[in-house]
Amino acid sequence: MGSMLKNFVALAATLVVIMGLFCIGPSVHAQEAAVTVQISVKDHRFQPAEIRAAANKPIILRIKNLDATPMEFESVTLRVEKVVVGNSEGIIRLRALSPGHYDFFDDFHPESRGKLIVE
């Protein structure tokens, strides 16, 4: 009976490892496929005001706020908003997007506008 228990434990451990690989595999792959785009905010203006990214790939926006005051990255078309405090960086993860133009702005300074062009 001892050997049956050992075989059962070995089989159970193997199944746990295999199931773990299935759970981790897709998320690691999705992170590898993501495209990172960097943008800065200085004097309440996006720099650059127009950014580009590849279509049909997840996008990571790295927003560096160089101002001392907070800003709020917002986009109605992307359905995101993110407050980035002064002198810090924020990250926004976007799903894979279809080709097109996606407007964004600083909700605290609405005159500050930009555009994400996905090609």
Language model features with spans:
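Beta-strand-rich interaction surfaces with strong enrichment in secreted/lumenal proteins
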Residues: 49-51, 79-83
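Asparagine-centered strand-capping/turn motif at beta-strand->loop junctions
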Residues: 63-65
